[in-house]
Amino acid sequence: MRINKELHIKDVFIIESKKHHDNRGWFQESYHMDNMSKHEFDLVFVQDNLVFSKKHVLRGLHFQDDNGQGKLVSCVKGSIYDVLVDLRKNSNTYREWMGIKLSEKDSKFIYIPPGFAHGYYVIEQDSLVNYKCTKHYNPNEEIGIVWNDSDIQIDWCDIDGFNSSNVIMSEKDQLNKTIKELNL
């Protein structure tokens, strides 16, 4: 397991976990508390989620108002473009975003700490995303930022096949507000 902590946004990191292949298929360790502790990450996950999505689905950008959730995100099947936005007001990268392609082929995971908005665009049909959370989901604390907020300027066009007219969103996500409207 290799952990990359040298990203431009502090406290976000990427984990690469090797897949062990044989004639039966493959095995991959998705989380190992002792290995994470060696890298000074003492994380306790309390909820594990699986999300199945069609191609062109865009989920987010979501965050929880009360200290938020840390998330360990991976794409188990298919591929996604995963995006996070730093909403920690005392951070040097406040309101900055980063994106990473996650797929079943690349064996990468991304850890997103509390204080970030998170979302993703589904690149391949029938993609399956897994994320572990450091805090239980609370619908009363959930807030959404619109995916194309002009103050954040996420470059979704960097994704193969992305076309804003093809985006599929939930009714709830269509009502997300801008960062200005939310006073963030």
Identify the function of each model-found stretch:
Residues 1-105, 126, 133-184:
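Non-catalytic, conserved peripheral segments adjacent to functional cores
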Residues 102-125:
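Conserved metal-binding segment of the jelly-roll/cupin
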